[in-house]
């Protein structure tokens, strides 16, 4: 299962969190759940168009009744902000026009872009679009991630690799990438490279380590207890039953069986003695 499913969705609530924070409980047009989901998709599409070189790793959206907060995590904040904040003002104006609400735009810098799977996938895709050999681009990205502190990385490219007539998939892996371990912090990214031969999909998995024991203890403390409630009398298991009482079947079956065997032996003794006497007379 862990080999197929998206690592972010597989670990929601364990090592990853939602990137959209809002709650929809209205049936009014424009405030329904499907309206907010459609709006989130349009916001992320707006962030991706024309901002390919900004290195946007993640876009988080939070909603209140009359305001929308958008957090942009980028490796190159200067491109997103623009000269004297002109680009940021343009983005804020387009978002307010799209949502119809006041927009709070926060631009956050990614401290370690070599450890962000989405940024690594974008970097490989840019090299493939520039006609760099796919194996060289994959291995270079893996070496950079390991130098940055990654415990494991896997990179996969799918498409007409090298301009081949038949499409195929190739992947390389360094270190450990435990996709089945839920406590493992797996970062996942996907990006498409546009080449003259067609599109090449790039997938990146980066293993950053397990959740610490302190975090596990905090989660266990905050989780509700699922233990059995104590019994009404005695300890948790309650008092032991006494063996002296009558059984449900009316008595001890083993003692009844022994009594029947003894009675049968007493009744059979005279008959056996008579048979022995007749044999001696003959």
From Swiss-Prot:
Keyword presence, Iron? no
Specify residue ranges for compositional bias: Low complexity.
263-276
Keywords assigned? Ribonucleoprotein, Ribosomal protein, RNA-binding, rRNA-binding
Span of domain KH type-2: 43-111
Spell out the Basic and acidic residues composition-biased ranges.
230-262
InterPro entries (alphabetical): KH_dom, KH_dom-like_a/b, KH_dom_type_2, KH_sf_prok-type, Ribosomal_S3_C_sf, Ribosomal_uS3_bac-typ, Ribosomal_uS3_C, Ribosomal_uS3_CS
Could you tell me what this protein does? Binds the lower part of the 30S subunit head. Binds mRNA in the 70S ribosome, positioning it for translation.
Coiled-coil intervals? none
The molecular function terms in GO held by this entry are:
mRNA binding; rRNA binding; structural constituent of ribosome
Assembly and binders? Part of the 30S ribosomal subunit. Forms a tight complex with proteins S10 and S14.
**Is the keyword Ribonucleoprotein assigned to this protein?**
yes
Q: Which GO terms describe its biological process?
A: translation
GO CC annotation:
cytosolic small ribosomal subunit
Task: State the organism of origin.
Answer: Renibacterium salmoninarum (strain ATCC 33209 / DSM 20767 / JCM 11484 / NBRC 15589 / NCIMB 2235)
- Family designation: Belongs to the universal ribosomal protein uS3 family.
Q: Which Pfam families match?
A: KH_2 (PF07650), Ribosomal_S3_C (PF00189)
| Region feature (Disordered) | 218-282
Q: What is this protein called?
A: Small ribosomal subunit protein uS3
User: Its domain of life?
Assistant: Bacteria
């Amino acid at each position: 299962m862990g080999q197929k499913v998206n690592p972010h969705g597989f670990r929601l609530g364990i090592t990853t969190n939602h990137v959209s924070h809002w709650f929809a409980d209205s049936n009014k047009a424009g405030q329904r759940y499907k309206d907010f989901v459609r709006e989130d998709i349009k916001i992320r599409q707006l962030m991706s168009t024309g901002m390919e070189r900004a290195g946007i790793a993640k876009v988080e959206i939070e909603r209140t009744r009359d305001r929308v907060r958008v957090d942009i995590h980028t490796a190159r904040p200067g491109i997103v902000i623009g000269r004297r904040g002109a680009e940021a003002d343009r983005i804020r104006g387009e978002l307010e026009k799209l949502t119809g609400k006041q927009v709070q735009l926060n631009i956050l810098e990614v401290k370690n872009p070599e450890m962000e799977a989405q940024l690594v996938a974008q970097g490989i895709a840019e090299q493939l679009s520039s006609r760099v050999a796919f194996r060289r681009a994959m291995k270079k990205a893996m070496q950079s991630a390991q130098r940055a502190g990654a415990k494991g990385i896997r990179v996969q490219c799918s498409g007409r690799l090298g301009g081949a007539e038949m499409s195929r998939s190739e992947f390389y892996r360094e270190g450990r990438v435990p996709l089945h371990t839920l406590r493992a912090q797996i970062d996942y990214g996907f990006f498409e490279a546009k080449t003259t031969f067609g599109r090449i999909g790039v997938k990146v998995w980066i293993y950053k380590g397990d959740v610490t024991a302190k975090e596990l203890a905090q989660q266990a403390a905050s989780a509700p207890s699922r233990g059995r409630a104590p019994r009404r009398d005695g300890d948790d298991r309650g008092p032991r039953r006494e063996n002296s009482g009558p059984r449900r079947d009316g008595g001890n079956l083993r003692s009844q069986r022994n009594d029947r065997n003894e009675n049968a032996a007493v009744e059979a003794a005279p008959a056996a003695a008579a048979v022995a006497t007749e044999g001696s007379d003959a």
